[in-house]
Protein backbone atom coordinates (compact mmCIF):
# COMPACT_ATOMS: atom_id res chain seq x y z
CA UNK A 1 0.00 0.00 0.00
CA UNK A 2 1.67 3.22 -1.01
CA UNK A 3 1.27 6.81 -2.17
CA UNK A 4 3.44 9.58 -3.66
CA UNK A 5 4.53 10.37 -0.10
CA UNK A 6 6.16 6.93 -0.04
CA UNK A 7 9.50 8.16 -1.33
CA UNK A 8 12.82 6.86 -0.06
CA UNK A 9 14.64 10.19 -0.29
CA UNK A 10 11.92 12.58 -1.40
CA UNK A 11 12.35 11.70 -5.07
CA UNK A 12 12.31 7.90 -5.56
CA UNK A 13 9.05 6.11 -4.85
CA UNK A 14 9.17 2.86 -2.93
CA UNK A 15 7.65 0.82 -5.76
CA UNK A 16 10.19 2.20 -8.24
CA UNK A 17 13.01 1.47 -5.79
CA UNK A 18 11.94 -2.12 -5.08
CA UNK A 19 11.18 -2.84 -8.73
CA UNK A 20 14.53 -1.40 -9.81
CA UNK A 21 16.40 -3.59 -7.33
CA UNK A 22 14.82 -6.78 -8.56
CA UNK A 23 12.17 -7.38 -5.92
CA UNK A 24 9.10 -9.26 -7.12
CA UNK A 25 6.42 -6.61 -6.58
CA UNK A 26 3.24 -8.47 -7.50
CA UNK A 27 0.76 -5.67 -6.94
CA UNK A 28 0.04 -2.23 -5.54
CA UNK A 29 -2.92 -1.52 -3.27
CA UNK A 30 -4.02 2.11 -3.49
CA UNK A 31 -6.04 3.89 -0.77
CA UNK A 32 -8.05 7.12 -0.91
CA UNK A 33 -6.58 9.67 -3.38
CA UNK A 34 -5.22 6.85 -5.58
CA UNK A 35 -1.76 5.52 -6.30
CA UNK A 36 -0.41 8.88 -7.47
CA UNK A 37 -2.29 10.87 -4.84
CA UNK A 38 -4.14 13.08 -7.31
CA UNK A 39 -7.77 12.04 -6.68
CA UNK A 40 -9.90 14.36 -4.57
CA UNK A 41 -11.22 13.47 -1.12
CA UNK A 42 -13.88 10.78 -1.36
CA UNK A 43 -13.42 10.36 -5.12
CA UNK A 44 -13.74 6.78 -6.28
CA UNK A 45 -10.64 5.51 -8.06
CA UNK A 46 -10.64 2.55 -10.45
CA UNK A 47 -8.03 -0.20 -10.49
CA UNK A 48 -5.44 0.11 -13.23
CA UNK A 49 -1.84 -0.70 -14.19
CA UNK A 50 1.19 1.42 -13.31
CA UNK A 51 2.55 2.73 -16.60
CA UNK A 52 6.13 2.94 -15.33
CA UNK A 53 6.45 -0.64 -14.06
CA UNK A 54 3.51 -2.59 -15.48
CA UNK A 55 2.50 -3.61 -11.95
CA UNK A 56 -1.27 -3.96 -11.37
CA UNK A 57 -2.82 -1.32 -9.10
CA UNK A 58 -5.71 -2.66 -7.04
CA UNK A 59 -7.87 0.16 -5.74
CA UNK A 60 -9.24 -0.07 -2.22
CA UNK A 61 -11.28 3.09 -2.78
CA UNK A 62 -13.40 2.38 -5.85
CA UNK A 63 -16.74 2.62 -4.10
CA UNK A 64 -17.11 -1.16 -3.87
CA UNK A 65 -13.92 -2.57 -2.39
CA UNK A 66 -12.72 -1.86 1.13
CA UNK A 67 -10.55 -4.95 1.40
CA UNK A 68 -8.69 -6.95 -1.24
CA UNK A 69 -10.19 -10.05 -2.79
CA UNK A 70 -9.03 -13.54 -1.84
CA UNK A 71 -7.31 -13.75 -5.23
CA UNK A 72 -5.40 -10.55 -4.53
CA UNK A 73 -4.36 -11.80 -1.10
CA UNK A 74 -2.97 -14.99 -2.63
CA UNK A 75 -0.79 -12.96 -5.00
CA UNK A 76 1.77 -11.91 -2.36
CA UNK A 77 3.61 -13.16 0.72
CA UNK A 78 4.49 -9.87 2.42
CA UNK A 79 2.53 -6.61 2.48
CA UNK A 80 4.68 -3.47 2.72
CA UNK A 81 2.79 -0.43 4.04
CA UNK A 82 4.34 2.96 3.26
CA UNK A 83 1.86 5.83 3.56
CA UNK A 84 2.45 9.34 4.86
CA UNK A 85 -0.17 10.07 7.49
CA UNK A 86 -0.84 13.46 9.08
CA UNK A 87 -2.06 12.30 12.49
CA UNK A 88 -5.83 12.83 12.24
CA UNK A 89 -8.51 10.35 13.24
CA UNK A 90 -10.53 11.19 10.13
CA UNK A 91 -7.57 10.94 7.72
CA UNK A 92 -8.24 7.58 6.11
CA UNK A 93 -4.81 6.08 5.47
CA UNK A 94 -4.56 4.37 8.86
CA UNK A 95 -8.02 2.87 8.32
CA UNK A 96 -6.86 1.32 5.05
CA UNK A 97 -3.81 -0.06 6.89
CA UNK A 98 -5.99 -1.63 9.61
CA UNK A 99 -8.26 -3.29 7.04
CA UNK A 100 -5.22 -4.69 5.25
CA UNK A 101 -3.80 -5.95 8.55
CA UNK A 102 -7.07 -7.78 9.26
CA UNK A 103 -7.00 -9.33 5.78
CA UNK A 104 -3.38 -10.39 6.24
CA UNK A 105 -4.19 -11.97 9.61
CA UNK A 106 -6.96 -14.02 7.99
CA UNK A 107 -4.76 -15.04 5.05
CA UNK A 108 -1.55 -15.72 6.97
CA UNK A 109 0.39 -12.93 5.28
CA UNK A 110 3.13 -10.84 6.90
CA UNK A 111 2.93 -7.05 7.25
CA UNK A 112 5.86 -4.64 7.25
CA UNK A 113 5.06 -1.01 8.10
CA UNK A 114 7.71 1.47 7.00
CA UNK A 115 7.08 4.16 9.58
CA UNK A 116 7.19 7.88 8.87
CA UNK A 117 7.13 10.97 11.10
CA UNK A 118 3.80 12.50 12.00
CA UNK A 119 3.84 16.23 11.10
CA UNK A 120 1.19 16.76 13.80
CA UNK A 121 2.87 14.35 16.20
CA UNK A 122 3.98 16.86 18.82
CA UNK A 123 0.63 17.14 20.59
CA UNK A 124 -2.70 15.38 21.20
CA UNK A 125 -6.08 17.12 21.18
CA UNK A 126 -9.80 16.58 20.71
CA UNK A 127 -12.41 14.12 21.99
CA UNK A 128 -12.00 10.35 21.82
CA UNK A 129 -14.31 8.67 19.31
CA UNK A 130 -17.40 6.96 20.72
CA UNK A 131 -17.19 3.66 18.85
CA UNK A 132 -20.93 3.54 18.21
CA UNK A 133 -20.05 6.14 15.56
CA UNK A 134 -17.29 4.07 13.98
CA UNK A 135 -17.11 4.68 10.23
CA UNK A 136 -14.83 5.01 7.24
CA UNK A 137 -13.56 8.30 8.66
CA UNK A 138 -13.09 7.10 12.23
CA UNK A 139 -12.12 3.57 13.17
CA UNK A 140 -10.48 3.64 16.61
CA UNK A 141 -11.26 5.13 20.06
CA UNK A 142 -8.57 7.79 19.72
CA UNK A 143 -8.61 11.62 19.84
CA UNK A 144 -9.11 13.73 16.72
CA UNK A 145 -5.44 14.72 16.84
CA UNK A 146 -3.90 11.47 18.05
CA UNK A 147 -0.18 12.21 17.83
CA UNK A 148 0.76 8.72 16.63
CA UNK A 149 2.73 7.47 13.65
CA UNK A 150 1.35 4.75 11.39
CA UNK A 151 3.63 2.18 13.01
CA UNK A 152 2.49 3.19 16.48
CA UNK A 153 -1.16 2.93 15.43
CA UNK A 154 -0.53 -0.55 14.00
CA UNK A 155 1.15 -1.79 17.17
CA UNK A 156 -1.43 -0.20 19.46
CA UNK A 157 -4.36 -1.58 17.46
CA UNK A 158 -2.98 -5.12 17.76
CA UNK A 159 -1.96 -4.69 21.40
CA UNK A 160 -5.35 -3.33 22.45
CA UNK A 161 -7.24 -5.96 20.47
CA UNK A 162 -8.72 -3.37 18.10
CA UNK A 163 -7.23 -5.19 15.10
CA UNK A 164 -6.58 -8.85 14.43
CA UNK A 165 -3.15 -10.06 15.50
CA UNK A 166 -0.96 -10.50 12.44
CA UNK A 167 2.72 -11.10 11.70
CA UNK A 168 3.61 -7.42 12.08
CA UNK A 169 6.97 -5.71 11.81
CA UNK A 170 7.44 -1.94 12.10
CA UNK A 171 10.58 -0.35 10.67
CA UNK A 172 11.04 2.74 12.80
CA UNK A 173 12.35 6.14 11.70
CA UNK A 174 15.92 6.83 12.74
CA UNK A 175 16.42 9.76 15.12
CA UNK A 176 12.73 10.68 15.14
CA UNK A 177 10.96 11.75 18.33
CA UNK A 178 7.59 13.38 18.81
CA UNK A 179 9.39 16.61 19.63
CA UNK A 180 11.13 16.56 16.25
CA UNK A 181 9.72 19.25 13.89
CA UNK A 182 8.83 17.66 10.57
CA UNK A 183 7.62 19.20 7.33
CA UNK A 184 6.39 16.94 4.56
CA UNK A 185 8.66 16.82 1.48
CA UNK A 186 5.74 15.63 -0.68
CA UNK A 187 2.05 16.48 -0.32
CA UNK A 188 0.22 13.40 1.06
CA UNK A 189 -3.03 14.38 -0.69
CA UNK A 190 -4.22 17.12 -3.06
CA UNK A 191 -5.63 19.46 -0.43
CA UNK A 192 -2.70 19.31 1.96
CA UNK A 193 -0.07 20.94 -0.27
CA UNK A 194 1.62 22.99 2.45
CA UNK A 195 2.62 22.66 6.08
CA UNK A 196 0.17 25.44 6.92
CA UNK A 197 -2.68 23.36 5.48
CA UNK A 198 -1.49 20.35 7.50
CA UNK A 199 -1.60 22.40 10.71
CA UNK A 200 -5.01 23.98 9.96
CA UNK A 201 -6.64 20.74 8.80
CA UNK A 202 -7.32 19.20 12.27
CA UNK A 203 -9.60 22.00 13.42
CA UNK A 204 -10.86 23.72 10.28
CA UNK A 205 -11.89 20.47 8.58
CA UNK A 206 -14.57 19.95 11.24
CA UNK A 207 -16.57 22.74 9.57
CA UNK A 208 -17.04 20.50 6.53
CA UNK A 209 -19.97 19.09 8.46
CA UNK A 210 -21.74 22.31 7.44
CA UNK A 211 -22.55 23.85 4.05
CA UNK A 212 -19.45 26.06 4.11
CA UNK A 213 -16.65 25.49 1.58
CA UNK A 214 -13.17 25.40 3.10
CA UNK A 215 -11.16 26.14 -0.01
CA UNK A 216 -10.62 22.63 -1.33
CA UNK A 217 -9.45 22.85 -4.92
CA UNK A 218 -7.87 26.28 -4.42
CA UNK A 219 -4.25 27.12 -3.68
CA UNK A 220 -5.18 27.87 -0.05
CA UNK A 221 -7.12 24.86 1.25
CA UNK A 222 -8.33 25.27 4.84
CA UNK A 223 -7.09 28.88 4.86
CA UNK A 224 -10.27 30.34 3.37
CA UNK A 225 -13.97 29.64 3.61
CA UNK A 226 -17.05 30.69 1.74
CA UNK A 227 -20.62 30.09 0.63
CA UNK A 228 -22.67 31.56 -2.24
CA UNK A 229 -25.02 33.26 0.23
CA UNK A 230 -22.24 34.93 2.20
CA UNK A 231 -21.71 38.64 1.66
CA UNK A 232 -18.70 40.70 2.60
CA UNK A 233 -15.70 39.07 4.23
CA UNK A 234 -14.14 38.47 7.63
Predicted feature residues:
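A short helix->loop->beta-strand "cap" motif at the edges of active sites that frequently abuts
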Residues: 23, 106-110
Amino acid sequence: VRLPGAASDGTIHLVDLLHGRGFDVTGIFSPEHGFRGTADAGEHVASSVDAATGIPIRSLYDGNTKRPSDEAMRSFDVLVVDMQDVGLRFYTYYITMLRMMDACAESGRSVIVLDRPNPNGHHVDGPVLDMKYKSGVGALPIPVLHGLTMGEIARMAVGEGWAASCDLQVVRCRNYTHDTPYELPVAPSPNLPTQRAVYLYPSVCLFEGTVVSLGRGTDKPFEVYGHPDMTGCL
